[in-house]
Swiss-Prot record:
Organism name: Baumannia cicadellinicola subsp. Homalodisca coagulata
Top-tier EC class: translocase
Residues annotated as transmembrane: 9-29, 78-98, 111-131, 156-176, 183-203, 234-254, 262-282, 296-316
Catalysis: reaction(s): a quinone + NADH + 5 H(+)(in) = a quinol + NAD(+) + 4 H(+)(out)
InterPro entries hit by this protein: NADH_UbQ_OxRdtase_su1/FPO (IPR001694), NADH_UbQ_OxRdtase_su1_CS (IPR018086)
Designated name of the protein: NADH-quinone oxidoreductase subunit H
Membrane topology, as annotated: Multi-pass membrane protein
Cell compartment(s), UniProt: Cell membrane
């Protein structure tokens, strides 16, 4: 009985520490991205608040908390309020199944991959609800774009993961990490990695797949009517999705927490940070394509590539058995 209580207490502590850390990192990503973009573009970036801009997060937090939390009179108040909460929560919960080290995972799910895909699907509902409840044509158009893009690229995301799942013989993310002891999945699943990363960019609505929020066409898309902390939940949620996709990329294709000499959680942090920097570098380097070009890329290149990768993986597994 005492041992059972200890396990429950440990699980609660893990959950609180992990989720608070992810929220803090997601909030701090705004400053980190602006500083990196400034470095890439030979300018300073935010450097006025604190030493080297280190207190910029505090300034942004104070600003967003004291902004008027305004709800348009023509909006559906209940759905308008629920949408950012659903988006933020669904993206945050994905980290509960992420193995940060051999002994640090909040929830050990045998259907971890399916749980991730389910949470990614729920975030689409939040975007649609937010765009529709705003009763604004630009919000609705942005929400429809986001839903179509996310649902399309979720197909490629799921198919690209299936090759990894077939190799490991499990949907459990910890098992997938353990299966990469001798060789990382980036080698046998290179095309799966490419499509997964592209689909991850699209699902996060990150540049160059940020058409749902394009300022020139849709005046910031589905969250145009949001302000205050409601906008903050959408804003931080997008950065949490960036961290989540980066963490999932290294977990599925780059051995997760595995590495020599350093502690496992340090390897997890280093690898995740590298892919976050790559995400930001892509934003600094690439132009934004048209919306139809994004959809054509998905259905004419990503889909055949994922199907080919899955077919080759199945043939190799059958041959080896």
């Amino acid at each position: 009985m005492l041992h059972l209580r200890y396990e429950y207490l440990l699980a609660i502590v893990k959950a609180i520490v992990t989720l608070l850390s992810v929220v803090t990192i997601g909030a701090y990503m705004s400053f980190f991205e602006r500083r990196l973009l400034g470095l890439f573009q030979h300018r300073y970036g935010p450097n006025r608040v604190g030493w080297g801009g280190s207190l910029q997060l505090l300034a942004d937090t104070i600003k967003i908390l004291f902004k008027e939390d305004w709800i348009p009179p023509f909006a559906d108040r209940i759905i308008f309020t629920l949408a950012p909460i659903i988006a933020f929560t669904s993206l945050l919960l994905v980290f509960a199944i992420m193995p940060i080290s051999p002994n640090w995972v909040v929830i050990e799910l045998n259907i971890g991959i399916l749980f991730f895909l389910m949470m990614a699907g729920i975030s689409v509902y939040a975007i649609l609800l937010g765009g529709w409840s705003s009763n604004n044509k630009y919000s609705l158009l942005g929400a429809m774009r986001a839903a179509a893009q996310t649902l399309s690229y979720e197909v490629f995301l799921g198919l690209s993961i299936m090759g990894v799942v077939a190799q490991a013989g499990s949907f459990n993310i910890s098992t997938i990490v353990a299966d990469q002891t001798h060789i990382w999945n980036i080698v046998p699943q290179f095309f799966g990695f490419i499509t997964f990363y592209l689909a991850g960019l699209a699902i996060c609505h990150r540049h160059p797949f940020d058409q749902p929020e394009s300022e020139q066409e849709l005046a910031d898309g589905y969250h145009i009517e949001y302000s205050g902390m409601k906008f903050g939940l959408f804003f931080i949620g997008e950065y949490i999705s960036l961290v989540t996709i980066s963490a999932l990329t290294i977990t599925l294709f780059f051995g997760g927490w595995q590495g020599p000499w350093l502690p496992p959680y340090i390897w997890f942090i280093i690898k995740t940070t590298v892919f976050i920097i790559i995400f930001i570098l892509i934003r600094a380097a690439l132009p934004r394509p048209r919306y139809d070009q994004v959809m054509i890329l998905g259905w004419t290149i990503c889909l055949p590539l994922t199907l080919m990768n899955l077919l080759v993986t199945a043939i190799v597994i059958l041959y080896n058995t």
